[in-house]
Swiss-Prot record:
This is Type III pantothenate kinase. Keywords: ATP-binding, Coenzyme A biosynthesis, Cytoplasm, Kinase, Nucleotide-binding, Potassium, Transferase. It is found in: Cytoplasm. A monovalent cation. Ammonium or potassium. Its main location: cytoplasm.
Length: 250
């Protein structure tokens, strides 16, 4: 691992909803591929791997992080079958990080949360980090310590579940544009509900945290985020954090 000279890294983030593969040249994300996790087959990755290898003519190094054990095992089998052990790095709770995790919590924290925290800790000692995906997550970084998390059902997941159970809402899609607070029809009322859930989740946590820490947001749709919320949007923060964890340990 220490002698790996490949400039091209395939960084893989396996989440509950999506599996993302980022192609990085040094620290720059130059290509992104995304699959729905529930339908993923290892042959999809094998084909993508071959295409990237043919395109960039570099030995490829794989950085892998997952919150789905069954998918992780498929990749471990692929690596073993193709003799790629020396070009593979597995994210876990026991690696060197740029922030501290309580000893008693090691092994209990999702790898995706570690990735997001690593990214933020490279920029600041204190931060509030919000991740919007299958779950809505808030993370607290204080003095380069992982101080806690809040996890709620993901908003897209919750709304899709609502829509699936309401017969009159079949085919409805959230547009999330120019949303008024109060509305007189179901579609606009749902749009408002979605936006207020999102803004309320963020604003309430910032308020209760009683801090002026920098706010990082990743995932989901933030097109109508309240202008009162000063924040930095970081696309694919987990992928970028996984790469930083690898670089700290190589």
């Amino acid at each position: 691992m220490k002698n790996n000279q490949s400039k091209i890294k395939l960084v893989i983030d396996v989440g509950n909803s999506y599996l993302k593969i980022g192609v990085f040249h040094d620290l720059e994300l130059i290509e992104l591929k995304k699959f729905k996790t529930k339908y993923f087959k290892i042959s999809y990755f094998e084909n993508f791997y071959k295409k990237v290898f043919a395109k960039y003519k570099f030995n490829l190094f794989i950085v892998f992080g997952s919150v789905v054990p069954s998918i992780e095992q498929k990749f471990l089998d692929f690596v073993k079958e193709n003799n790629l052990e020396n070009n593979f790095f597995l994210i876990n709770n026991y690696l060197k990080l740029s922030f501290k995790v309580p000893q008693e919590k090691l092994g209990l924290i999702g790898n995706d949360l570690l990735g997001a925290m690593e990214y933020a800790s490279k920029e600041t000692s204190n931060a509030l980090i919000f991740l919007f995906g299958t779950a809505s997550v808030a993370l607290l970084l204080e003095k380069l310590n992982f101080s806690g998390a809040i996890i709620a059902p993901g908003m897209n997941f919750s709304f899709n579940n609502l829509l699936s159970k309401a017969k009159k809402l079949k085919g409805f899609k959230l547009h999330k544009e120019n949303v008024s607070l109060w509305n007189l029809n179901t579609q606009d009322a749902l749009e408002s509900g979605y936006e207020n859930l999102k803004n309320g989740f963020i604003k309430q946590i910032i308020c209760k945290s009683n801090s002026n820490y920098p706010v990082y947001i990743s995932g989901g749709d933030i097109s109508n985020l309240s202008p009162e919320i000063s924040h930095q949007f970081v696309d694919n923060i987990v992928l970028k954090g996984y790469l930083l964890i690898y670089l700290k340990n190589c």
